[in-house]
Amino acid sequence: MSEKYYSLHNHTASSNARLIDSINKVEDLIQYAFELGLSGIAITDHETVNAHIKAIKYVEKKRAKDEAWKDFKLILGNEIYLCRNNLNSVNYDSKKDKFYHFILLAVDEIGHEQIRRLSTRAYEHSFMKNRMRRVPTYYSVRRRCQNGS
């Protein structure tokens, strides 16, 4: 691993909570990234952090058994859906409202905690529309992130 290369946008089967998006098992995805010689990989499922614990445990297990894994970087993230403030099932207009996809990557444990909190808030505001669970992260979240709250 002389040159650093990280794959920063990857989905696992945990992304399938709302629709079928990926067949990647967490362990298989991480193992394959290592076998390809990547320096690390980010887990950025669709508005879920469910795979993070499994990913952390897998990498820790590999590091404990194999020195070659010591520099492999696991990056924890989330693909959020940014939308207008206060969007809900009553005021949602499929012709006007957009859910912009943004990738968030945690640089440390504080960042990972913030991502988990954002995901929780998004699910607290989620709603069903046209057989799809909408999981909004409101634009106003930018101020919260900048202020660290």
Identify what each model region corresponds to:
Residues 1-149:
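Phosphodiester-processing cores and adjacent nucleic acid-binding clamps
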